[in-house]
Amino acid sequence: MKVALIGASGKVGGRLAAELTARGHQVTGVARQPAETGVVMVVADANDRGALAAAIRGSDALMVAGRFVSMDAATILGAVADAGVPRLLVVGGAGSLFVAPGLQLIDAPGMPAEFLPEVSAGKRFLETLQASDADWTFLSPAAQFGPGERTGLYRVGGDDLMRDAQGESRISYEDLAKALVDELEEPRHSRKRFSIAY
C-alpha cells in the first residue's frame, strides 16, 4: 500500500517507517522541514489543509505519529477528505484510557503537570475523530512507552489501561509500530480506538 506518514523522523514515526518498509509498503514521509528518514520525504505543514492534501493525495492511508500540541485534528481530517485518502491511522496516547470506572489516566492522581498539555491535546484529537465521518483508527499505547525490542507479541484492548500481572503497563515503540501496521493490513478497529500492552 501507499502510506503517507506524518512524523516519519520521530521516535515512533521512524519505527513505523521501518516496519512499513520491511513489510513492502511504499512510504512517503510528510514534514515541515526536510529530514533524513530513509524514506521519500515531502515537505508540507500538517496544519495547512491544502498543502497536506496535496502531499497525501494518491495514498491508501495516512498515519499520524506527531505531537498533538502541534497538530489540529480538524485540519488533518479535512486534508484526508480533500485528498480522497480512505484511511487515517493515528498513534495516540494513554492519557485518555480509563484506569477506573469514569476515571481517565489524565485525571488520575500523579499525572505529571508537564505532560498535561500533550495529553489534553491528544484527548481532544480523539474526540474530534469520534465526531467525524472518516474511517479512522486511534491506537493508544500502554502507560510506559519507549524504545525497546520488537517482540511481535502484544495484547489488544479497548478504552481501559491494561496492566500485566506485576501491575505494569508497558509497550515498546517497535511493537506499537507492528500493531499499527497489523491494523493497516487487517483492519479490525475502523472508527474506533484500541489499546495495546504486554
Spans of model-derived segments:
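NAD(P)H-binding glycine-rich loop region in Rossmannoid oxidoreductase-like domains
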Residues: 35-83
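C-terminal substrate-binding/catalytic lobe of Rossmann-fold NAD(P)-dependent oxidoreductases
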Residues: 116, 131-198
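Glycine-/Pro-rich loop/turn segments that contact NAD(P) or position catalytic residues
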Residues: 68-154
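Conserved beta-strand positions in the Rossmann-like core of class I SAM-dependent methyltransferases
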Residues: 4, 28, 137
